[in-house]
Amino acid sequence: MSLCTLAINLSAIKNNYFLLQDICKTSLVGAVVKADGYGLGAVQISKALIEENCRHFFVASSEEGVNVRKALGIDVNILVLNGVFEHDALELIEYNLIPILNNLKQIEIWQQFGNLKNLLLPCYLHFNTGINRLGLSSNEIEQLINNRDLLKGLNLQYIISHLAISEEIDNPYNLEQLNKFKAYLRYFPSIKASLANSGGIFLGQDYHFDLVRPGAALYGLNPLMQNPVTLKAPIIHLQNLTLDSHIGYNMTFTTKRDSVIATLPLGYADGYSRNFSNQGKVFINGRSVPIVGRVSMDLINIDVTDLPPSDIFLGQEVEIIGNHCTPDKIASIIGTIGYEVLTSLGNRYRRKYTR
């Protein structure tokens, strides 16, 4: 078992959910739990949020959806963002998963399996309004508008779209997407709608519609939200090095003074990026400590020379992620985003869920 502890505060995630509910008073608030709840545990997070009456959970694939369904039971909606494919349609039906249909081919597949089972199968439609990843194209949407038989035999519950740059509040592309979405919805007046992701929630009520879909904000990846994640590692080795000593693979760091170097039991195999080599920071009792040398597969070295001797001992806990170094803060060091930091954490850590 790993010597490092990844602690996930479910109460903090719940508090973030409450705040989002307060912002979106006229809308339902779902939860995006894809990628194993952004690396933090989809099942544990979903169970916590269902206690607060969350009833819409978004996953990427049927496999993720089955995992959540088995944990939660039948009294929730589980939405599959990648839609349906011929190889997993029966699994979606068996586990009552709702696909978000992204093109005419997926609509056709879902209709065919509905006819096969003599069922009116539930679905959402995804209209592409400008992110240009998934979603029905403007040409496909026009076909649906002009030929409603293309949706015959389906229980269409929601129409959704996805914002491309919602974290930039003043970017005009947000309004462009909103207006395009509203224009499409005029042709489907009886169908509920969903547009806002985490960033979209903070763009204002015009973006909320009937259901919002926060992911990042639930997990503290927003300045207004509470960070629920703490990753700590113990010092497992200490050494005193003289001036001009080399540290780690390829000798990328050379001491400029007599130094005290501590070794921690985590590395890139644990999702701690090699890009933190010689530029990452960790914290001991609130004081910043630099990473020196290469991040290796299972180990990193830190320079603790400037700490008081009372803080330097075998077993001392070192904060890798926490309130001093949130996922967003450490992501900025290596030019990535907090999402990547969380989803890269892997399964080697000892996990602890608190409330």
From Swiss-Prot:
<comment type="pathway">
    <text>Amino-acid biosynthesis; D-alanine biosynthesis; D-alanine from L-alanine: step 1/1.</text>
</comment>
<feature type="active site" description="Proton acceptor; specific for L-alanine">
    <location>
        <position position="249"/>
    </location>
</feature>
<dbReference type="InterPro" id="IPR029066">
    <property type="entry name" value="PLP-binding_barrel"/>
</dbReference>
<dbReference type="Pfam" id="PF00842">
    <property type="entry name" value="Ala_racemase_C"/>
</dbReference>
<dbReference type="GO" id="GO:0030632">
    <property type="term" value="P:D-alanine biosynthetic process"/>
</dbReference>
<comment type="similarity">
    <text>Belongs to the alanine racemase family.</text>
</comment>
<feature type="binding site">
    <location>
        <position position="297"/>
    </location>
    <ligand>
        <name>substrate</name>
    </ligand>
</feature>
<dbReference type="Pfam" id="PF01168">
    <property type="entry name" value="Ala_racemase_N"/>
</dbReference>
<feature type="active site" description="Proton acceptor; specific for D-alanine">
    <location>
        <position position="34"/>
    </location>
</feature>
<comment type="function">
    <text>Catalyzes the interconversion of L-alanine and D-alanine. May also act on other amino acids.</text>
</comment>
<feature type="modified residue" description="N6-(pyridoxal phosphate)lysine">
    <location>
        <position position="34"/>
    </location>
</feature>
<dbReference type="InterPro" id="IPR020622">
    <property type="entry name" value="Ala_racemase_pyridoxalP-BS"/>
</dbReference>
<dbReference type="GO" id="GO:0008784">
    <property type="term" value="F:alanine racemase activity"/>
</dbReference>
<dbReference type="InterPro" id="IPR001608">
    <property type="entry name" value="Ala_racemase_N"/>
</dbReference>
<keyword id="KW-0413">Isomerase</keyword>
<dbReference type="InterPro" id="IPR011079">
    <property type="entry name" value="Ala_racemase_C"/>
</dbReference>
<keyword id="KW-0663">Pyridoxal phosphate</keyword>
<dbReference type="InterPro" id="IPR009006">
    <property type="entry name" value="Ala_racemase/Decarboxylase_C"/>
</dbReference>
<dbReference type="GO" id="GO:0030170">
    <property type="term" value="F:pyridoxal phosphate binding"/>
</dbReference>
<protein>
    <recommendedName>
        <fullName>Alanine racemase</fullName>
        <ecNumber>5.1.1.1</ecNumber>
    </recommendedName>
</protein>
<dbReference type="GO" id="GO:0005829">
    <property type="term" value="C:cytosol"/>
</dbReference>
<feature type="binding site">
    <location>
        <position position="133"/>
    </location>
    <ligand>
        <name>substrate</name>
    </ligand>
</feature>
<dbReference type="InterPro" id="IPR000821">
    <property type="entry name" value="Ala_racemase"/>
</dbReference>
